[in-house]
């Protein structure tokens, strides 16, 4: 099938879908015919965040009557494997792709290849340079960093020594969070001294733990820490607990998992900036299907960001974000 012919055929296959993107009623199921396949490609396959993305994508697939192909690299620093996954699903002739790019530059060419081959791509979670894609569905990551800075600054009364433990070079989402965090500190908390701002935790909880352990040894008088994602937050939590500093050092992290939620409850974490990964996965699939149906889709979909603390973690809204329903994956 030629690249020009593919969108026409897919439009016909999907023309029976009765969908509303994000209103009171969800998208309806598809009609008959061959079931289109949407490839959903995360940055990795292990973190709780990606499981929640998968749950959202699966829910959208069920409601829209499309098949979800969930496939990604095992590790969040394996750019080459993610590129290979994108190339593989292009060769399979999927109807569309929803991609969380590991690197904002390295994935540009594969996305361009998909679009040129008539396969629409929706970017989710983390941005991509250029504009060769259909839509971008994500948290306002800069604002997430701002929320983290304001909460940590307030916890410290506007004064103190802190560490910023970055995530991974090339990750657009966490870079935006780190930038928002530092900008907010500069603007509102001049009495806070950032002792470290250029150290990267790496893609795993183990490398994050090793970095945090080293930094806690170098800066025993640190009073606060901010981490921009799940793995850096968990690795740092472990280092704080093993050094008996958990609860003493004000600690604000990002994203959730059962162990991070328990640490918030125990007072070892003082705030978790929360995204809505189920919504990200869900709307990523919705946007690509709407595009295939010939509908106009927004360039940018903001899925929201908030912060969980010990004071609000039992409210229904926050509980749903801290412990999302993943039962559709069972």
Roles of regions detected by a PLM:
Residues 22-330:
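A residue-level marker of the well-folded mature domains of exported/periplasmic proteins
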Residues 9-20:
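Bacterial N-terminal signal peptides
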Residues 1-11:
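Bacterial N-terminal signal peptides that target proteins for export
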